[in-house]
Amino acid sequence: MAIELDLQLAVENEEGLPSQQDFQLWLDKTIPLFQPQAEVTIRIVDEKESHALNHEYRGKDKPTNVLSFPFEAPPGMEIDLLGDLIICRQVVEKEAIEQNKPLLAHWAHMVVHGSLHLLGYDHIEDDEAEEMESLETEIMQGMGYEDPYIAEKE
């Protein structure tokens, strides 16, 4: 089975979005480094849905780039469902421009970043952030993209 993707496009305009193959590749280059099989839903949304979910689950009154919802199976239940990623199209596009990054690279970074959250990584504490950012950079560079944090390091 490897990594199974359920891609949901919940946006008014689907033009210019990465392809299903792009999203699959990004998952395939990230998750198998930690576990051999997984099911992941990626839902691409507009700002309204991202804002509502970010407010409900994180108490933040604005849309955000990616939300991660890990699936926690009941004890004793063997299931490959890793969780859901909710990615806001407008926020990703705006950030790519602001950060002077190629749009496809920023989409890839959001999938890698969100996948690491599903796998239990976090960036609340400085040491956790350093470890997570290091993994993100390694994975992104392994796919031929630049360090996603290069602007912050200069």
Curated annotation (Swiss-Prot):
- GO MF: metalloendopeptidase activity; RNA endonuclease activity; zinc ion binding
Q: Could you state one GO cellular component term attached to this entry?
A: cytoplasm
Principal place where this protein is found?
A: cytoplasm
Residues at which Zn(2+) binds: 113, 117, 123
User: Where does this polypeptide localize?
Assistant: Cytoplasm
Q: Which cofactor does it need?
A: Zn(2+)
The record describes how the cofactor is bound as:
Binds 1 zinc ion.
Q: Which UniProt keywords apply?
A: Cytoplasm, Endonuclease, Hydrolase, Metal-binding, Nuclease, Ribosome biogenesis, rRNA processing, Zinc
Q: What is its EC number?
A: 3.1.-.-
What InterPro entries would the database entry show? MetalPrtase_cat_dom_sf_prd, YbeY, YbeY_CS
Residues of the signal sequence?
A: none
Q: In its UniProt record, which GO terms are filed under biological process? A: rRNA processing
Functional note: Single strand-specific metallo-endoribonuclease involved in late-stage 70S ribosome quality control and in maturation of the 3' terminus of the 16S rRNA.
Family to which this protein belongs? Belongs to the endoribonuclease YbeY family.
Protein name, per record:
Endoribonuclease YbeY
Identify the species of origin.
Vibrio parahaemolyticus serotype O3:K6 (strain RIMD 2210633)
